[in-house]
Every structure is written in C-alpha cells, then in structure tokens.
Amino acid sequence: MDMVTLGSTGITVNKNGFGALPIQRISQEDAVYLARKAYRAGIRFFDTARAYTDSEVKLGEAFDGIRTEVYIATKTAAQNAEDFWKDLHTSLTNLRTDYIDLYQFHNPAFCPKPGDGSGLYEAMQEAKAKGMIRHIGITNHRLAVAHEAIDSGLYETLQFPFSYISGEQELELVNKCKGANMGFIAMKGLSGGLITNSAAAYAFEAQYDGVLPIWGVQREKELDEFLSYIDNPPRMTGEIKAVIDHDRTELCGEFCRGCGYCMPCPAGIEINNCARMSLLLRRSPSAEHLSPEGQAKMKKIEGCLHCNQCKAKCPYGLDTPALLARNYEDYKRVLAGEVKV
C-alpha cells in the first residue's frame, strides 16, 4: 500500500483520495454507498467544497458516527470574511461535524494574506484558533497564485491540477511544495476525463512521494478501479510509459481541461464539455455526445455572443471562443459522416 503524508499537516493516508465533486450528480443513496464503500476499503481522505451543491450533505450522512476515522477537506470561494463564516458554518452543518480537517480557499484570483484587506486569512486563523478547522490550504489553477502561496509560508497544502500530461511548470510546483514541507493534492489526475487509463495515471502520481491524488468518483466501477490499486499499486512499466508517451503526443498543445471556471456562459453554452468535444468524441464513448441532447448542447455554440468572458476567466489562458468554433466544426463533420471517430 502506497502512503503519503501531506507536509506539515501530519495527515498520513493511502495514495488514493476521494474527489467528491461528481457525487453531486447522483442520488443521496448512491453517493452515501460509494463513500462508505471507499472508507471500508481503506480510503481515508475525502475532498469536497461548498460550491459542489449537495456533495457535503452526502458525505455528512456517509460518515455520521465515524467522523474521527476519516479526513475531510472542503473549500470556500468566499471573497470576504462575512461570506467565509457563512460558508464555514454551512459546511460544518452539512458535514455533521464540529471541525474540518483541511479548509481550503477555493481557486481565488489572488493569494489571501493577513492585512490584504479581504479579511479572509484572518478569518482562517480565527477559525483554526477556535478548533473549527485544523489545517489551512489553498486550491488553484493559476501558476502565479500557486507560487505565491508556497512562498508565503501561510499554507499547509496546495491543491493544483497534476497529471501525466502536465508540463515542467506543474512539476516545479510539486518539487517546490516538497521543499517547503507543504502537502500537494493533485486534482485532475485524469485531466477531466481525457486520460482513460487509470493505472497509468496512478503509476505516474505514485512516483512523487509527497503527492496525494484525488480521483473524482461517480460510478462504482470507477471506484473499484482505484480500490484495486490500494493493495496492488501500478508501477511505471515500459507498457505504461508507452501509454503515457502516446497520450502526451496526442494531448499536447492547447486543449480545454474542463475545469468549468469559465462557467456560467451568458449564451448557455456548456463550455467545459463543448470546448473539448473533439477529444471527448475520440477518447470516450461517442454515442452520448452525438445524441439529440448532445447535438442541442453543441448547437448553442452558434449563439456565442463573443463577449470573451470565458477567455478572460480561463486559468490556462486559452482562446476559448476559438476553441469552441474549432470543436463545433469538427463535431458537424463527425455528424455528417465526413470524419470517423
């Protein structure tokens, strides 16, 4: 069993974290079942957020009565101290607990610090002093904010996208966190569904002893894959390296990671899927994307307002309207039978 310690927090768990964003899409009963199954199999770290609709509520029911046996991380996207306290109290109620193991600022556009005028970090400190939270973390998709958080010495963990199609810049963050004794939580280990070989994804993350990957789980078969890696962790074999090299070649350049931070779109476009449809058609079962419902979603691209809000919000600096246009043209060719997927 691979184990990881999250820096100075002392939180030590097996190298399989449960990402609870997807369980907002399934029933309470199914979500509770998955979370409890994960716990029984040995997963101890569960990551959610106030922004993930009813995800916290579902975890709260799942761990009622066994709270001290799991580590729960959640997040606030508050922009001021007043909203911070509202989020924290709501999360505590939803999770049926009086403390949160790791409380994280959720993808802020800046790095909260004492005296910056927002009151956010001071609120974190007060919550920790009161025992409402035990450790302070930050999540982000922006390299500059991530570096500032590490350099500040104010945070115990950083959560950032990291997968085998990441570049040298992300690897630099991993090494920098290790040098600062700061835990690194890897989100997007499957790159929003573009990586389809979970064994290769796990083997890559396992190379870095200070990294805890959290896997977004919505279906039991997905959970079962990662549970199998607890006792039989995949290693970097020649076969797995070949898979990684192939994907790195295919997924190089500009592509949408599906993070959703450009949403909502004023034209109603489901950008986080539509802007990467060409890849989804070729790397996942295409029937759902080509269904009448899928076609209706893609057709909304025709109503793009060219307001460039999505482009301005993209943490990866992508030209999102141009990506949407290219993906829509390819989609229409696939529908017309001009291109096979």
Which residue ranges define each predicted feature?
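N-terminal binding-site loop/beta-alpha segment at the start of enzyme catalytic domains
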Residues: 1-70
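Generic structural signal for well-ordered alpha-helices
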Residues: 3, 35, 56, 60, ...
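Conserved, mostly hydrophobic/aromatic
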Residues: 6, 18, 46, 59, ...
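Glycine/proline-rich, positively charged
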Residues: 29, 79-185, 190-193
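Structural motif
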Residues: 37, 41, 94-95, 152-153, ...
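Structured C-terminal cap/extension of enzyme domains
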Residues: 43-44, 172-186, 190-341
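Short catalytic-loop micro-motif centered on adjacent basic/acidic residues
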Residues: 44-49, 73-74, 134-137, 157-160, ...
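Short hydrophobic/aromatic-enriched beta-strand-loop microsegments
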Residues: 69-72, 155-163, 234-240
